[in-house]
Amino acid sequence: SVVVTRDAARIAAVADAIGTMPWIKGAPILLLVCGDIRRGRQVCAHHGRAHANDSIDTFLNASADAALALGFAVMAADALGLGTCPISYVRNHLALIEDLFALPAGVFPVAGLALG
């Protein structure tokens, strides 16, 4: 999952929480790249099946998917001439980030990506 915000106040709140990256406030767009461990469970439940890999495998797959999405977002932004700054520090402030972006249970931030 990717949450996109152009809300300067929300972007500033992320920068303030991190405290060591003030340049984040200058980004016109912030992507929050998330892992989603709900999706497999929801699909299985929809089809009336047990989620056979409901283990650390689910977490690892969600994390890897998010990392791939982050990498491809960086490449796409570069192709468009946009600068990027990946922000792993969002994981150091989980409660704030989850609240600020209204993340549902089972969705967790992997990294932010400042674009501009």
Describe each PLM feature range.
Residues 1-34, 40:
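N-terminal amphipathic, basic helical "cap/leader" segment at the start of enzyme domains
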Residues 41-50:
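Short, flexible, mixed-charge acidic loops at enzyme active sites
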